[in-house]
Swiss-Prot record:
One of its GO terms (cellular component) is presynaptic active zone. Disulfide bonds join 47-185, 333-369, 507-540, 546-557, 551-566, 568-578, 934-962, 966-977, 971-986, 988-998, 1147-1183. Glycans are attached at residues 195, 329, 340, 398, 668, 974, 1047, 1137. Belongs to the neurexin family. The chain crosses the membrane at residues 1218-1238. Residues 1239-1284 are cytoplasmic. This is Neurexin-4. The gene is Nrx-IV. InterPro entries: ConA-like_dom_sf, EGF-like_dom, FA58C, Galactose-bd-like_sf, Laminin_G, Neurexin-like, Neurexin-related_CASP.
Length: 1284
């Protein structure tokens, strides 16, 4: 029955490009949903029917009773291959082409055998297979099951349309075991065939298109690289041009702004295989997708509405049109062309019956899709070839074919002449060359074309040889070579190799020998076709690995048949995919890694590997440590403003050397930024000060970063409506708020620094009140560059002070490509810096042995690792940088910006890293092998992670800043603190003390006969400034404490206690004998005293410090000719020297002469020979001084892990249910047992006749006596007579 005309009108009206809801779902490839939520996505009406009821299932292999027929979803068994390898396929033949929307999988019931990840492939003929790909053109890895019993669904957001579907398991648990179901519906196709001269025209004059949103989707297949697929234009300059150009899909459009926007997607689209196209526009945002590879763009210009009011063409145009870059009409098939939700081909078919045929014009088109007689052949290896027959002993040779390849080398044709010699056509560096050897003639090499033909496009090739002439024709460009030669052809022609191991790898079609063309399907395997499956007939199985471009940051992609390569030379980035920046993150980052000059011009990359490009700046390094970054612009010179009277009539936009996103990144990372702006004026007002907020009408103003007119001048405060002089009260006219507002005929100036980062930089300046060019009014402005100081990236520092402390970041989606940059500072030899895991994948960076960094990861296959060893220590408590990158080709580790190492990915599909755990910084995910030290500047894919914010949350073992245990100087008495961050140790080598904090005394208790001598070895020591220290205690106020002498010069120094109990120093350093007495204290009272003797000022000043008294300085007048140096010191004595009879009696410790500690040396194990006791044997003593101790380090305890309340509640609910059931069962059993025992007790005598007649009469002698003594008695009542 014919539908009403109004409905048809509505259908045609819907052609006016509305929004296709289906396309809006195409954003991220695949949605995984659980079984209980699946009905929320599709209803039965939405194409959601099981498709495998009558499907035929086959597999590459299977175990007994686990064949492919067992792989149906609701079966009790499952398909299991013989071996667990990656090369197994489960193939589903659906009988007819179907639209597949969803797949469901299960494992083997009641076991742990299930598939966790798989690839889906589909085919139109069961021979040529294509993988379902993600938006980056990589095979999509579908998530599988987590156990053997539950169902897991995956939704194909762009449906699969095919008859054959096969599943390739890539990851599994225990064994590969699968049960499968596909959901979808029958596929009804509406086809339209174009032969290269045809087209369809739809008249839009009656119903023009005016839309802000539209969507188009269709399928096509073709064997030709160029052709117009869809075109329309309007009278206002709008046009919409969809076309094939060099086997890529190109969309050019203009919304009337006279600026064309061009998008390109897809590659190798002329392979005569169906391709899915989806285009969706929402105002100026557009999505363009071919075979699920998505390109997003933004239409140039200001307009958002598409106006088309002429014709809409499909398959071609009658003449050249604006926006078209190809001239050929389309050759091939279009299927199910949907404008919004209306099938255009169906409407066109019905239009004649409905009387709407006048709207459509069809030229040389049919409603069908015949297969073209073109059968490509793929040579997959260099050893594969085809051997075809020709006319033997012919005087002419003619061979033609089409070829496409990505290889630079390979033999395409080899023929041995019957008359002797040969012909070889080969590729060398992508150029086609001819190697010709004719009998009795010299061998010649023909190189006639400068072009390279290994670009993946189809190229035509024809070669013909006849007497004295060779004609080579490539892409319709003939080259003739004339040479004396005569050939007789042989019988065999080797195509793509055969005689040479370096065969051709790529595709060929229409191979003709001597004018004869034989269909590839008719070639005889083994006789004409070599190497079995290495030659694929009726398919061109080439992969364009450069589309979409895997090289980041505009790197140039090249490829061969196995892999791609990136040329990063012009990008400023490095690595296999141009991911890692060669430019520093900031000026401070440059200073941290290398020596710098005072001023350096360079490019900064503020986000590292992120999307922002490098931009030029000037770095200024000052002696006080300040680092300033200067960003220039185009208007830094002083500019005169004259002849602009109206407020803001003069406008100057400022163009910086960076775009807005780059500038915002620089501002956000800097500690402070400022920009100087000044205006010099003569009788030209700046503001209209003073003024109220509602009456502020300035003559001039500047524009902020967000295009906001600002109400204050540089140097003032936001909202003040003043200049700097108005804030300070120093304006030329005290009644005004700006100098220029005084309207003086003298030159005045208002200027200052704008320091509010939220408004910087200045986008534009506007000036007025400068009169006419003939009057005296005039102004001059100067805008300086944007200057910034500091980098918050390097002040974002945290300290890990406990080995199992960690910062848990959200899961890091490293995917196919990602990088992590950080700087660390530690003294630890072995630790894990970061770690993250997934179900099978993981990443881990660890420090090993103090001088080697190791990055380990696993992405589906076995674990891989890359190591960087250094010739220096990485645990030297200095900052070191590390950059970790993993991409499609390799993993890369860079240490300190220069030491690099890589590990290549294994051949085959590159799997994305699937990480589900937190990214744990500072330990493993189990909080083991922890890191202690400092970490800063953590960047994930170029984005800074605010570690300080995490530390402010009070995390266990984490501190803000880089604060070690040695910051508080815990080591005393010149001890050297060795940082460990979770603790510390003290090196007392340069101290007269020992102990954990160099606070334990090393002393000796001296008697009158005790003497200790230290002999200076080697060259004699001479000093002009000494640092001498000695501690002592005594109750006998006399004696020699410490002395130095030289027998060579007679010079000496003696420190002793005088008989009066005072400290006395006597010395002679060559200028004259001197004696110093410290009279303020009596030193013989048994107290401990600490004395320092020092010289300075060229030996003319002696400083004597005792205990906590103020130092006393003694100055000596030494002549310029005198020698104040203590020359050739030979001996140091403690207690007395050899010339004395009685020595010091008491305890001496802390003996130090510069860097010599004699008591420490004498009491160490294996003491040196130059220090010894010459008197009685001495033992070490602490002289009654208790060592200083520090409070113990507070012990922290890791808090209990956070528990998901929902999961906990669910777990408790499950446990409660189980416990309740168990308790009920136990109570029921106890009740049964209780009833049983009660019944048994009540019925324990049932069935027995029992009496108590013998009770009490067991020992009776006779029956009468037994009756009398029995308990029951003889039942004769004894009568009693009572008297009342």
């Amino acid at each position: 029955m014919r539908p009403p005309r109004s409905n048809t009108k509505a259908a045609f009206s819907s052609l006016q490009f509305g929004l296709l809801c289906l396309l809006l779902l195409v954003n991220n490839g695949i949605k995984s949903v659980q079984a209980d939520a699946f009905t929320d996505y599709f209803s039965d009406y939405d194409c959601n029917q099981p498709l495998m009821e009558r499907a035929v299932l086959t597999a590459t292999s299977s175990l007994t009773e686990r064949g492919p027929d067992k792989a149906r979803l609701n079966g009790n068994a499952a398909w299991t291959p013989v071996e667990n390898t990656y090369n197994h396929f489960l193939t589903l033949d659906l009988g007819d082409p179907r639209m597949v929307r969803k797949i469901a999988t299960m494992g083997r019931m009641h076991t742990d055998e299930f598939v966790t990840e798989y690839i889906v492939q589909y085919s139109d003929d069961g021979e040529f297979w294509r993988s379902y790909v993600n938006p980056t053109s990589e095979p999509q890895m579908f998530k599988g099951n987590s156990d053997g019993n539950s169902i897991h669904y995956n939704v194909f957001e762009v449906p699969i349309i095919a008859q054959w579907v096969r599943i390739n398991p890539t990851r599994w648990h225990d064994r590969i075991s699968m049960r499968v179901e596909l959901y979808g519906c029958d596929y009804i196709s509406e086809n339209l065939y174009f032969n290269g001269t045809g087209l369809v025209r739809y008249d839009l004059r009656r119903e023009p298109i005016t839309s802000t949103k539209e969507s188009i989707r269709f399928r096509f297949k073709t064997a030709f690289a160029n052709g117009v697929m869809m075109y329309s234009r309007g009278t206002q300059g709008d046009y919409y041009a969809l076309q094939l150009k060099d086997n890529k899909m190109v969309l050019n459009l203009d919304l009337g702004s006279r600026v064309m926007t061009s998008l390109s997607v897809g590659s190798l689209l002329d392979d005569n295989v169906w391709h899915d196209v989806v285009i969706s526009r929402n105002q100026r945002d557009i999505i363009f997708s071919v075979d699920r590879v998505i390109v997003r763009g933004r239409i140039q210009g200001e307009f958002t509405r598409l106006n088309l009011n002429r014709e809409l063409y499909l398959g071609g145009v009658p003449n050249v049109q604006e926006g078209l870059i190809v001239q050929q009409n389309f050759s091939g098939c279009l299927e199910n062309i949907y404008f919004n939700s209306t099938n255009f081909i169906r409407v066109m078919k019905d239009s004649t019956e409905l009387g709407e045929g006048y709207l459509f014009t069809r030229v040389n088109t049919i409603y069908a899709c015949p297969s073209p007689p073109i059968y490509p052949v793929t040579f997959t290896t260099r050893s594969s070839f085809v051997r075809l027959k020709g006319y033997e002993n012919s005087q002419r040779l003619n061979v033609s074919f089409y070829f496409r390849t990505y290889e630079e080398t390979g033999v395409m044709l080899h023929h041995d002449f019957y008359s002797g010699g040969y012909l070889k056509v080969f590729l060398e560096f992508g150029k086609v060359k001819i190697d010709l050897k004719v009998k009795d003639k010299a061998r010649i090499i023909l190189d006639n074309y400068d072009d390279q033909f290994n670009d993946g496009k189809w190229h035509s090739f024809v070669i013909s040889i006849e007497k004295n002439r060779l004609i080579l024709n490539i892409d319709q460009r003939p080259m003739t070579t004339t040479k004396s030669m005569q050939v007789a052809t042989g019988a065999q022609y080797y195509i793509a190799g055969g005689k040479d191991k370096n065969g051709f790898v790529g595709c060929m079609r229409l191979i003709s020998v001597d004018g004869n063309y034989k269909l590839p399907q008719d070639w005889v395997k083994g006789e004409e076709v070599c190497c079995g499956d290495d030659v694929v007939v009726d398919a061109c199985q080439m992969i364009d690995r450069c589309n979409p471009n895997p090289c980041q940051h505009k790197g140039l992609c090249h490829q061969n048949s196995r892999e791609f390569f990136c040329d990063c030379g012009h990008t400023g980035y490095a690595g296999a995919v141009c991911h890692t920046s060669n430019n520093p993150l900031s000026c401070l980052a440059l200073k941290n890694v290398q020596h710098v000059q005072q001023r350096v011009n360079l490019n900064l990359d503020v986000d590292g590997s992120g999307p922002l490009e490098p931009f030029p700046v000037t770095c200024e390094f000052y002696s006080d440590g300040r680092v300033i970054t200067t960003l220039s612009h185009s208007q830094e010179h002083t500019t005169t403003v004259d002849g602009f009277q109206e407020p803001g009539s003069f406008e100057q936009s400022i163009m910086y050397d960076a775009n807005q996103l780059q500038i915002e990144a620089l501002l956000n990372r800097s500690h402070s930024c400022w920009q100087r702006l000044s205006y010099s004026c003569r009788s030209s007002r700046l503001f209209n000060s003073p003024s109220e907020a509602g009456n502020f009408r300035p003559f001039s103003w500047w524009i902020s970063r967000h295009n906001q007119p600002m109400d204050y001048w540089a140097g003032a405060l936001p909202g003040s409506r003043k200049c700097e002089c108005g804030i300070l009260g120093k304006c030329h006219d005290p009644t005004k708020w700006c100098n220029c507002d005084s309207n003086s005929l003298e030159w005045m100036e208002d200027g200052g620094d704008i320091r509010e980062k939220e408004y910087l930089p200045v986008r534009a300046v506007k000036f007025g009140d400068t009169g006419t060019p003939l009057d005296e009014k005039m102004g001059r402005y100067t805008l300086g560059p944007l200057r910034c100081e500091g980098d918050d990236l390097f002040s974002n520092v945290v300290t890990f002070r406990i080995a199992d402390a960690s910062i848990n970041l959200p899961p890091f989606d490293m995917g196919h490509s990602g990088d992590i940059y950080l700087e660390f500072r530690t003294t630890q030899e072995n630790s894990v810096i970061f770690h993250a895991t997934g179900p099978t994948d993981y990443i881990k960076l660890s420090l090993n042995g103090g001088n080697k960094l190791q990055f380990q990861y696993q992405a589906g296959s076995g674990p891989l690792g890359v190591n960087v060893g250094t010739s220096y220590h990485l645990n030297d408590n200095n900052w070191h940088t590390v950059s970790v990158e993993r991409n499609r080709k390799e993993a890369r580790l860079v240490v300190d910006g220069s030491i690099k190492a890589e590990v290549r990915e294994p051949p085959g599909p590159v799997r994305a890293l699937h990480l589900t755990s937190d990214l744990v910084i500072g330990a493993t995910t189990e909080y083991r092998d922890g890191y202690v030290g400092c970490i800063r500047a953590l960047l994930l894919n170029g984005k800074m992670v605010d570690l300080k914010e995490y530390s402010k949350r009070g995390l266990y073992g984490i501190s803000t800043g880089c604060v070690g245990r040695c910051e508080s100087n815990p080591c005393l008495n010149n001890g050297t603190c060795i940082e460990r961050y979770d603790g510390y140790s003290c090196d007392c080598r340069w101290s007269a003390f020992k102990g954990p904090i160099c606070a334990d005394e090393i002393g000796v208790n001296l008697r009158s006969s005790s003497i200790i001598r230290y002999e200076f070895e080697g060259s004699f020591r001479s000093t002009i400034a000494e640092n001498i220290r000695v501690g002592f205690t005594t109750t006998i106020p006399k004696g020699f404490l410490l002395g130095f002498s030289s027998n060579l010069t007679g010079e000496y120094l003696t420190i002793q206690i005088s008989n009066s109990g005072h400290l006395r120093c006597v010395f002679d350093f060559g200028f004259e004998r001197q004696e110093i007495i410290f009279p303020k204290k009596h030193f013989g009272l048994g107290q401990y005293h600490d004395m320092h003797f020092m010289r300075k000022n060229g030996g003319s000043t002696v400083v004597l410090k005792v205990d906590n008294y103020e130092p006393v300085e003694y100055n000596f007048d030494i002549k310029a000719s005198a020698d104040a140096q203590f020359n050739n010191i030979q001996y140091m004595y403690i207690g007395k020297n050899e010339s004395m009879t009685d020595g010091f009696v008491g305890c001496v410790s802390r003996v130090q002469f510069d860097d010599i500690y004699p008591l420490k040396l004498m009491f160490q194990q294996n003491p040196p020979k130059n220090v010894k006791s010459l008197g009685t044997q001495l033992t070490e003593d602490f002289c009654g001084v208790e060592p200083v101790t520090h409070p113990p380090i507070e012990i922290e305890t890791r808090p209990p892990p956070l528990v998901d309340e929902e999961k906990l509640r669910k777990a408790y609910n499950e446990v409660d249910s189980v416990l309740l059931a168990c308790l009920l069962v136990i109570l029921f059993l106890l009740l049964i047992l209780m009833f049983f025992l009660i019944g048994r007790y009540l019925h324990r005598h049932k069935g027995d006749y029992l009496t108590h007649e013998d009770q009490g009469a067991d020992g009776a002698d006779d029956p009468d006596d037994a009756v009398l003594h029995s308990t029951t008695g003889h039942q004769v009542r004894k009568r009693t007579e009572i008297f009342i």
